[in-house]
Amino acid sequence: MPQKFINSLYISFIIILISFSARSAEDLKSIGKFKDWETFTVNENNNKICFAQSIPILRAPKKFERNPSRLFVSFRPIEDIKDEVSTTSGYSFQKEKIVKAKSGKKTFDFFAQENFAWILDTEEEQKFIQAMKKASRVMIIGRTDKGKQTIDHYSLMGFSKAYNTAKKNCS
């Protein structure tokens, strides 16, 4: 398993836990709200992490019970990681299946591991980020471990400012 993936799994897990944990809420600092996106910083063992995140504006199917979904772009300077794109859709993804992100005519593949999915290739991450800066919406399409398809629609209003704020605070 690639080292970047292992590190991503660990850090994304921390971000999710911090995002939902009242105990750790004081460690998580919002540094800007930009329409549908928000930027945060957190210090974990003297490791500063910055990330832009959003929640879906629409989740389908509506009656499917699951935990919250998030789309992230993260920066971890101590590990020389920048522009890391990841998502969680609130359930365990189907094993050995690709999670898709669609924006307009462009499609990007995410590698799924349990509750998280990442773009593993840095060039693809850059292409995806550029697409997000130009688009107004992105859809994340995944399947549960039982095969049920979900689609999370994210607004990209405010993405560029949230992204730039995260990047600036962790450079």
Predicted regions and their residues:
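A generic "folded-domain core" signal
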Residues: 24-171
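Bacterial N-terminal signal peptides
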Residues: 10-19
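Catalytic cores of transferase enzymes with a strong primary signal for eukaryotic protein kinases
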Residues: 5, 21, 46
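Bacterial N-terminal signal peptides that target proteins for export
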Residues: 1-10
